[in-house]
Curated annotation (Swiss-Prot):
Feature: transit peptide: 1-87
Membrane-spanning segments: 114-134, 146-166, 176-196, 197-217
This enzyme's EC code(s): 3.4.21.-
Entry similarity comment: Belongs to the peptidase S54 family.
Record protein name field: Rhomboid-like protein 14, mitochondrial
Length: 334
């Protein structure tokens, strides 16, 4: 999150760098994490505001995270949507590069459904904790202008929460702006250092993200099994993808019905499958729709085969001479 009174968009030319990094990162992955890609796309589209979504999404002036306005107007739009808005390209690119790395790590290890559930939960928790912190500071210390009336936007509060979750089990050390710290406490070091080097950064928003990550881990540890949000995400995912799965099943079913293509077999039985008959001359499996063997041309009607609905047809000879079989194959495929 960053604090700004007014203004928007300064700096440029960094979005191609973000696009190049995302493409390169996804290209090398055997499995492409879809939720991370969707979050990157959503944040970028909200910032760019292309013509096809510009009339639909609110302007940044309508979604600034401002505790005073949220409480005064009960404006939940500011509470949730402000996380997806950024004031300029450096702000967007820095956050999205961080999301790219953290998102891929977490989604790969957790799975898409659980990762989507976690992100959805952390957005609400980080924004909610920040709101409560601002209100508490107002009531306890009369901090009015400093936090309660500030304007902020950005995904960084959620990223701090994700960092806490990602590093919760780490036992090694990490470098934070050149300072070596235990990885599990890296978010706290980054909170202080970011505030030192980026004065406009929202200290309260980042702190709210860290606390949200800690609360999420505590709740997750005390609850066994899938949480309700994960179950809901999985249910919605199954519902949305049902038409695709249905069509995929139909395509596979049609492929299983062999239409004029078979295989050469050596089994003792002549029954190869539903609607399939095996040529006794060359043991090639043919579609039940064919009256002659596709491999050697032997006619099914002359007793050269088995089918699911009939046994071996009676014939005075079950095998053709080898020379005749070779001749028929040459004629068939020449």
């Amino acid at each position: 999150m960053e604090n700004f009174g007014e203004g928007r968009r300064s700096g440029g030319g960094m979005l191609p760098l973000l696009a190049l990094s995302a493409v390169a990162e996804y290209y090398r992955l055997p499995w492409k994490p879809p939720v991370t890609a969707s979050l990157l796309a959503a944040n970028t589209l909200v910032y760019l505001r292309p013509a096809f979504i510009d009339p639909v999404i609110p302007h940044i002036s309508e979604v600034w995270f401002n505790p005073h306005l949220i409480f005064k107007h009960k404006d939940l739009k500011r509470l949730f949507l402000s996380a997806f808005y950024h004031v300029n390209e450096p702000h967007l690119v820095y956050n999205m590069m961080s999301l790219l790395w953290k998102g891929i790590k977490l989604e790969t290890s957790m799975g898409s459904s659980e990762f989507a559930s976690m992100v959805f939960t952390l957005i609400g928790m980080s924004q909610g904790v920040t709101l409560l912190l601002a209100k508490s500071l107002l009531l306890l210390f009369d901090y009015d202008r400093a936090y309660y009336n500030e304007y902020a936007v950005g995904f960084s509060g959620v990223l701090f929460a994700m960092k806490v979750v990602l590093n919760s089990q780490a036992e090694d050390y990490s470098s934070v702006y050149g300072i070596l710290v235990p990885t599990k406490y890296a978010a706290w070091a980054e909170l202080i250092l970011v505030q030192m080097f980026v004065p406009n950064a929202s200290f309260l928003g980042h702190l709210g993200g860290i606390l949200a990550g800690i609360i999420y881990l505590k709740l997750k540890g005390s609850y066994s099994g899938s949480d309700p949000v994960t179950m809901a995400v999985r249910g919605v995912s199954r519902l949305v993808t049902w038409p695709l799965r249905f069509l995929n099943g139909m395509v596979r079913s049609r492929r299983r019905r062999i239409t004029g293509r078979g295989r050469v077999g050596r089994g003792q039985t002549g029954i190869a499958g539903p609607g399939i008959w095996r040529c006794q001359s060359c043991t090639y499996d043919n579609s039940g729709w064919l009256s002659a063997c596709e491999m050697c041309g032997s006619g099914r009607a002359r007793g050269n085969g088995w089918s699911l609905n009939q046994g071996p047809a009676l014939s005075s000879s079950n095998d053709l001479p080898l020379d005749e079989l070779r001749r028929r194959r040459v004629e068939r495929f020449s």
